[in-house]
Curated annotation (Swiss-Prot):
Miscellaneous comment in the UniProt entry for this protein: Despite having helicase-like domains, this subunit does not have helicase activity.
Family classification: Belongs to the helicase family. AddB/RexB type 2 subfamily.
Protein name in UniProt: ATP-dependent helicase/deoxyribonuclease subunit B
Gene: rexB
Pfam families: ADDB_N (PF21445), PDDEXK_1 (PF12705)
Region entry Disordered, spans: 737-758
Top-level taxonomy: Bacteria, Bacillati, Bacillota, Bacilli, Lactobacillales
Domain of life: Bacteria
Amino acid sequence: MATLQFVLGSASFDHQQVMLDRLAAQYQQAPNDTYLYLVPNHVKFTTEVAVLKGLKKRLKQTGNYAQANVAVLSFSRLGWFLCKDDPDYQKPRLSNVGMAMVVAKIIRELKAESPDLLKMFRGESERQGFATEVTKQLVELQNANIQPADLAPDQETGIIKRALASQAGGGRASQSTVFTDKMTVLYEIYRRFEAAVTTHVTAPDRSAMLLNHLEAADLSTTHVYLDRFAGEFSAQEQLIVDALIQRAADTTVSLILDRDYRGRELPSQNNLYYRSAKQYQDLLNLATQQVGVDVLDPIVLNQPNQRRVSDALVGVEEWMEADARFALPDRLPAPTDQVGFFTAPTRVAELNRVATKIRQLVATGQYRYRDFLVVTRHLDGYQTMLEPIFSRHQIPVFNDNQRPMATSPLATFTAALFKVLKDYYQEADVMELLKTGLLVPETPEELQQEGRAKRNPNTFMTAVYRTENYCLKFGKGGRSWFDERPWRLEGEQPESDALKRQNAQINWVKNYIKDELAPALADLQTATTGRELATKFYQFLLDQGVRHQLYSWAHQAQESGQLTQLRDVQQIWQTFGTLLDEYVTILGDQVAPTEQPGQLVAEFADLMNAGFNAGRYAQIPSTLDQVLVSESGMIQDNQRKVLFIMGATDDVMPEVKASEGLLSDPDRELLKRGLNDDQFLPISGTDQINNEPFLNYLSMLSVTERLYMSAPLMSSDDSELTLSPYLKGLARHFNQWDDQNNAPTTDLPDRPNPRASEDDVWSFVAAPAVTMGNLIEVERLSKDTGRKLTSAWRDVARALTRYDEGLTGRLNDIRDGQYAKNEAVPLQPELAARLYTTNRQGQVTNQLTASISQLEKFYQNPYDYFLRYGLHLKKRDELEVSSDKSGTLNHDALAFFVQSVIDEPDLQLADLVKEEHQGRQAELIDQAFEQAMNQQEELRELAANNSRVNLQLQVAKQLITTMAKTLCLQATQTDAQPVAVEKAFGQADWTGESQAAELPALTFDLTGAGLGEGAKVSLRGRIDRLDELKLGEQTYQLVVDYKSYNKAFDLVDAYAGQALQMLAYLNALQAANPGKQLLGSLYLRLYVPTVDAGKEGTAEELKEHLYQGITINDDAVLAALDHGLGEKGATLLSIKKKSKKDTSRFKVSADDQFSAKAGSNLVSPTDLKRLMDHNAELIKEAAVQILQGQNEIRPYRRQVGTTAETGLAFSDFLDVSRFDQALDDYKEIELTDADVEAKFEQEEE
């Protein structure tokens, strides 16, 4: 007769030792019998080691010990152990990855055949990973012993009908509809899935085969032990357990239970042991209902000497038991160092403290790294920081949380490859493919480097990055890859060697896509069956060297001892092979539809992606002596000594959340009502929440000696976190809670303190690198606060240098870094001369040739000037119509338009307003835009490659049209006439080519500034438009500068150097034409204003384009410049009639008729000359400082109203200069208009 016996006891007792005692005793009596020790798969390996070790000791064996008749197995491994010779068991197995692939295919078919069927999941079904979720749901149904036929919605006696009938009259019609729709979808997918995999064996199939084997086999000499199964079995596992109990000679089951519940009612659901008690009674009832099973009295563990944990952990158990009953046990009389609690500001700080404590405990000599277990409810929040932090602490760590394969290079490569094909070679897809590093074509001869292989990944990747920049700049992609003409980077002519190499790089990549990759991908589309497609794809990977590159990575990992990376490469290639095998076996005979030639490839791509999304890396420890990191919801072996529970916050300890998956908690509860007795789903909803204390309890008692709980106070998004009630309650129970501060009394300080005691300092002593970082931090704090370091810190410093003499140098270097400031070292004048005065022939001169805007940049921030014009840094070009490009286009178009009018003697701008000249006006505008576009072929190429850029050019055409018409309208309101456009000065000094109409450079002698003989500064520039106003015998010159924004003439900026342009233009004009009078400089904003319908081309529109700037204050000149300054008001100038409150020296006209509005200034010819002289001094001062090597990181700052303007506003090099705004090291501009006025008045005195 078969027997059943239970080993009962709470988690603090040593169940395994009792099980091993019984196993050893039985083995001595019947050594030839078979002994099966079943445990959860997660702890199989460690349990096997412990069982063999325990048997060796009990059987008094010496030397190496093995057992042929004792097997430690999981349920899945038990199937192989007993059924490996069964022919059906030898059928091809369908992995989880293969299952996901089949499900993905079914979902794709349903979308095509019955799109309304998936309406419940219409949005989700398009999401990556949906097939994996559906697969998990199907596996759950299979494990619950639910067959597709059971879910048929129209079956009167089926599960669905029974479930719906159970809630009849409950007023839940909407839930019933949603439930029915979901189950209909699942039924259809499940039904098709079962039909599709008949030639394969799935995991549930193997369980069914195992059950059949058990029911037929002779197990009279088999002894079964079940250990570590907490809570409940799945439906299929339960059937297997029932068969084992009935058929085996004897079965021993270990359960975590506080007492024997035979003949008793189950405890309340909030009892800590409720799930175990229910499992106990379920097994008892099943056994008693079977003939031939004798239930023996249980072995109840309740003696102190049977415990496996320390007294401190027994205290943890007592508190958890009481807390589950809503009781409050007495506090323990005195604190213990075997249980500790602490908080940290962030997860990073928390993990650092955990690592520090582990390191310190190992240093005592009482522990090895393998004695530590670190858990948290979910590792997601710590995943990216685990390895870096433990590595810094020099702690070997093994993370047993399975990592997904979806982000592996091969998975990314496969997804990107088929996306390239699907979306026709878009730049982002091509770059994602190439950046995986798996494609390494042969290097062209002109790019080969001595000592490098013909196929060099680094050489190719450099070319890929260069090509990406080119594509982003010019909008390349799609058909551009197949251009017959070579791509070209424009540059100096003739081409330099560097430019030739860059052009060779981008064409190498382009030609590889065009000549190698594209034909190979096109060949994939010729496949007529799934088998042929899989074969072609595999051959493609071989031909393109993908497998070779993976093997190369594996070899590098092996050479460097990176065993995890080595196994990752091996596993991903093995998974890929499994995917192809299962695809060919199941779908290999699928024929490509002739009416949709790309469908076979598209489906193959979807299935491969679904397969990789379902794939997980198998985790294998690289060494035995490692800290184990896991999740608290998983069963752990009980061999480790010290536990750290991280992330102990109230959102996860206990965790209250809905079940994951396609079925919601209400769906699951409703489905359970229709199940048969031999069918049941995993617990969910309220049952799962009620079981949370038990899961946390098992985690806390999974070690033998110490428990530490920690929590971060802030999440990764800086939201505040609340401590877990378990942490608070246990800390109070162990007299380690400070109610006044609402924190553990054993909490560690957030940062090192210079005056810390030896105990506090100890909490910051860890691995050398970490300890050194803490020491440097506290030394800096000591310096900043003036508090001296305690002797404990000085002892740490001495210990570090004694530990490793090499640390002394590093420590001193870092200490020196504390006093380092982010200051640029001034250039030597010789180096400055080489950087700034080298001409186009490569000769170092003593002449600074620059543009006015460059000197403005120097006044805004000298270091930015050095980076841009000394080192010639520039930001990465991207696909955009930048402000520079659009500004040039607008300026060129208006220049062509105005110049065309100037070139026609009988035509003036004002004439084009007349009706008879409207056609001519439109013709000139079109010609001007076309001529401007001809000057920027780059923009044409951008527009041809990108619809967004094309739209931007259409907007630019509208702007140019509006502004050309505005210029014509403005010409009717003034006596001034344009005489030149794009008037250049100093360009010959820069290009070496003189132009007949060009003005000489604006040049200043710098002799006497300590720069040597012949030192000078030569400025170049280009005046957008030059107007002349003739009044009597006098000719006045007026500078017009176009701006894309509302630019005002700021007197302070002009006086301080931030705005040199307009006065410098006047200086250049005066130097070239001293006989002509200067009228001033004006800005005109280029934009399309919003004007009421019917008011286009009227004075209303003119007022939207008023000029702002600086002009002389002669009333007669102003009236001639703007005819509207009479009764009707200004139509061109930002000027108004003077009021009594207008008294500023720079705002009022000479005869007190007019005053300037904000953004404009009216000055006397004398004051204009003073401003121009000051402008010249600013130019010379900037030039002298530049040539003397001045390059300090000191941007200007000026408060304008409520806004602080700084020299950082438009910098492209913030990451290079690393200016710390918190240090406030700006060059403050505190001048006001009144201050400038006061300076002028002082000069007059």
